[in-house]
Structures are given as C-alpha cells and as structure tokens.
Amino acid sequence: MPSDLAKKKAAKKKEAAKARQRPRKGHEENGDAVTEPQVAEEKIEEANGRETTGDGEVDLLTKELEDFEMKKAAARAVTGVLASHPNSTDVHIINLSLTFHGQELLSDTKLELNSGRRYGLIGLNGIGKSMLLSAIGKREVPIPEHIDIYHLTREMPPSEKTPLQCVMEVDTERAMLEREAERLAHEDAECEKLMELYERLEELDADKAEMRASRILHGLGFTPAMQRKKLKDFSGGWRMRVALARALFIRPFMLLLDEPTNHLDLDACVWLEEELKTFKRILVLVSHSQDFLNGVCTNIIHMHNKKLKYYTGNYDQYVKTRLELEENQMKRFHWEQDQIAHMKNYIARFGHGSAKLARQAQSKEKTLQKMMASGLTERVVSDKTLSFYFPPCGKIPPPVIMVQNVSFKYTKDGPCIYNNLEFGIDLDTRVALVGPNGAGKSTLLKLLTGELLPTDGMIRKHSHVKIGRYHQHLQEQLDLDLSPLEYMMKCYPEIKEKEEMRKIIGRYGLTGKQQVSPIRNLSDGQKCRVCLAWLAWQNPHMLFLDEPTNHLDIETIDALADAINEFEGGMMLVSHDFRLIQQVAQEIWVCEKQTITKWPGDILAYKEHLKSKLVDEEPQLTKRTHNV
C-alpha cells in the first residue's frame, strides 16, 4: 500500500496541476495565489524597479518620478463597469470614462482585452494612450485581482546590483523557495516539506532561471561581461533595458509596454519583436513603429474621438480595414443626407396640397422621424494631418564633408571605435547608419559636427556648411519655463512678429494653447516638435538625425519623412524605426568592427539578416550560459 508521504505527494501534485490550469492571482512565476490585493501591488511595484532591499535609500530621481506619477494619478478620474465574468481570463469593461485635470479623454466607451491577444494601442500625441495604460496598471479600472499586471513605467534606479541579479530577483516566489530549500536541506525532520519545495521549484523551472534571464539580457544587447557590471555604471537607457528584461522574465498575465523600443538599437528591436510574438497572455503595446506593430500585434485599438475602436489584425490590416469602413460610412452618410433633403423638400412642397399628396407627405414625415430617432450615420472625422518643413538651404559645391584616414578612441588606453575611416558626404547624401549599440553611430555624427575630434586623421568641411544635429537629449536644452512661442522668439530674434512665429511653430503640429503654454506642461511628443522646429530654422545644409522618432506618433513620423524627402540638403539618420529608414534612406551604412561598410540591399533585407543572426546565435548562447 502507498505510504502516507506518497499519498500526500500525489495530492500535492494534483493540486499543483489544477493550479496550473487556472491563472494565478500573483505573477505567473510567483506560484501560490496572492489573496491580498496589497501584496499583489507590492510585488508589482517591486517588479517595476523600486528598491526594496539594501540600505533603503531611494534614488532622488526615482523619488521625483514617483511623486510625479502620484500627482498624475490624483488628477486622473476613471469610471467603468466590469462586464466579463469575475473569474474569466478576458477583461471586458463597459461605460469606461477617463478624465485628466477635468479634460475628457474617453467617454462611455468599452475596453476589451482577451487572453492570447497582443494589442497595439494607437492614436495621436496627447490623446491619452499613456494615461490609459497608467489607469489599467494602477487598477483604477475594475480588473479582477486574479489577473496580475506588469506596467513598465521607468528605468531601474542605480544600485550595486548587476543586471542579472536585478532580473533574477524579480521572481520573488522562486527566490523565497530557494532560500527556504537551502535552510531545510540540513534538517531531516522537514524532509516532506523540502520535497514539496523542490517539486514547486521544478514547476517554476528554477534550475533554468539564470539561463533564461541571461538569454533575455543578451537579446536586449547585454554581453556576458555587461550582465555582471553594477547597475550604477549604466546610463538611464541601459537601466531601462534591465527594467524591460524584468518584465519579460516574470511573464505576467497582462503586460503593458509604453514605447519599449525607444532605448533599443535595431538588433535589440528585432529580438524584442520575435520575443513578444510568443507572448500568449494579454499584451497592450504603445509604439510609434509601424514595422514593430506589424510584427507583434494581433489586434489594434484606435483611441480616437474619446472612443476605443477595435480592429482585428496588425497595423497594415488596420489601415486597410479602417479605410474601407470610413469609405462605407461616408457613402452611408451622404445617402442619408440626400434622403433627408429629398423628404424635407417633398414635405415642404406637398404637405398642404391635395389629399393624396398630403398623405404621401405625412408618410414621408413619419419615415424621416423614424430615421432621426434610430440615429443617423456620423460624418467621418479624420485625424489632423501635419506638414513639417525644412527651409531651402541653398547650394554649396562638393565636397561638403571629407573624412580622411580618421581613427577615434575616447581615451588613450580605451578601445578603438573607428580605424582609418575614409569617405565623403554631399548635399545629395541620404544615409542611415545601422549597427549594434556601442559600434559608434552617434559618435560618428559627433565627429562630423566637430563635437568630438579625431584621434588620428582629418575631417575637412566646406567653409559655409551649416549642420543641424537632432539628438535624444535635445529636450534637456529647452527652457521649460518659456512657452514654445517665447522660446523660438528668443532663439530667432530676427523674426519680430509673433504671428509669423506662430505660423512657423504651427507647421510642426503645435497650435492654439500649446504655443503659449509653458514647455514643461507639454507632452514628450510635443517637446520633440519644439526641438524639430528649432532645428529646421537653423537652416542647415546637412541634417544629422539621431533617433528623431522617440515620443512621436505615427502620423508625425510620416510628416517628418515627407519633410526629409523634400529637403534640399543632405541627411544622415540613426534610428530604430525600420519604416522611417525605408522611407528616407537611399543607402545603408553598417557601423561595426571599427569601420563602416555599405550594405548591399535595403533596410528590410538588413532586418532579415538580423533575424538570421538570432537563429544562429541561440544554440551558442544556450551552450555559453550552461557553462556560466
């Protein structure tokens, strides 16, 4: 007969099997169900980067961000009713409304998030996409407690921990079980409990946790050496990658990502796209990259006119479906308006005529009343279209910039970034620089502008050439207390009339109150537009654009692409947006191994090359991680 211990083990296994068949209240990898909402919230906060161990000191910037988020939450009001079953893994909320500082962002709409679907949330800058994600992440909408949520909100704070440690520790249940198992390993009296712990750890694949964490970090660009550096030695962009790695490692039931590609290079973007394709629960993603949305999403949610509208398929399918629906809607609208005009005209002409005509007029009046009562088709309200503009720069004879035998390293004993570069660029140059992080793409732009000097060799520039460089930190140079109008008038005093400057700023999507509000009150996307307006009116011959799409919406990026294509001068671009590169670049230059080589195909061929590299690297990575 089976022993009592064997019976208990069998019972535990059955219970564990049942638990695996239903979603857990805590994180999927945290095991046992979380019964206290407060505990669940603490786990989510810890996962999002809050320091919970050590000396208890919180990075000052992190504290400021927390205070800022609290103020935003206090100014936010959300109402909605859960319409799906409380135990369902799908989330259906009706009568959803969202206001911020009294401004209505959503009104009486519905939120539908189904298990196994990956949603792209799209809409114009400032329409409230990030605000909606925050409301979901903070559970201000009625989402059942058994659905755990991970909302990636900020970078990891600087600390003594390594990226690998930070990713591993996010799985709090596994870490607790391993500590408990280690304690009980020497106590024979707790043999049964120890076996239960080992069984649970086996369910969590605890022995593979480090390998999985290392694989995720590698995909996001961390070499084995970088995975063991201290977090305080990384920039904010790299610490954001660590936070993203934690989100992917913990595998929550609902994952909310707001512009996850902003701090990634093309290699990491391709890896992340392939990784998210395998996400089997609920993913809600805000991204400005059409290519990324096409690769990841199974559904699109369009935030428009205070409503959430749902489309099946990726971004390209959404565009096609929306166009067809709007064409049909306008046909229906015009048909109804024609019918209404005809009936009103008939009623006016024959309402007081002969008995027969009067009866017909009354019949048409009843038909008209029924049409009005049942609701008429609305006219299609199109999104506002932007039209960016780079002023004519005039012609200067080639060569504009000559790079002759240039080598560069940041320090005398540091690694060589470039060695013996030799090339020229002119006003007809349209180049995208690609390559892994650290290969020197941004460094090259700084060398060409003169912000950095070559270690060896020479860079010759035409005496009259003007260069405009857009980079990720340009926003930091803005005077936040000034309005866009005041800032531009200060930067370009030769423009005396405010109305003339208003027209200039208006071409970059800043209108009305946005022009006269303090810059600090603008969204990140609107601040980027101020920077683009400032850059354009420097009247450069050469545009050097380093990640110009961060924080911009899809419509703004398309307007930027059109403006670049109409620009008379030369352009060099660093971007993780494959579609923008495809739109504006005539050549692809690969920065790698201390040199620059011209890619023989277009950017889409380069993307396929990166995908094939991922397939080739996977077995080597697994083998290397096993040997760690």
From Swiss-Prot:
Phosphothreonine sites (modified residues): T223
Ranges of Basic and acidic residues composition bias in the record: 40-53
This protein's record includes keyword Nucleotide-binding: yes
Residues that, per the record, bind ATP 1: G123, L124, N125, G126, I127, G128, K129, S130
Keywords for the protein's UniProt record, in alphabetical order: Acetylation, ATP-binding, Nucleotide-binding, Phosphoprotein, Repeat
Disulfide bonds: none
Annotated InterPro entries: AAA+_ATPase, ABC_tran_Xtn, ABC_transporter-like_ATP-bd, ABC_transporter-like_CS, ABCF_EF3_subfamily, P-loop_NTPase
GO CC, one annotated term: mitochondrion
Boundaries of every ABC transporter domain copy: 91-330, 401-618
Residues modified as N6-acetyllysine: K309
The organism's place on the tree of life at top rank: Eukaryota
Residues modified as Phosphoserine: S517
Repeat as UniProt keyword: yes
Start and end residues of each stretch annotated as Disordered: 1-57
UniProt GO molecular function: ATP binding; ATP hydrolysis activity
Residues holding ATP 2: G435, P436, N437, G438, A439, G440, K441, S442
Pfam hit, one: ABC_tran_Xtn
Family: Belongs to the ABC transporter superfamily. ABCF family. EF3 subfamily.
Designated name of the protein: ATP-binding cassette sub-family F member 2
Protein source organism: Mus musculus
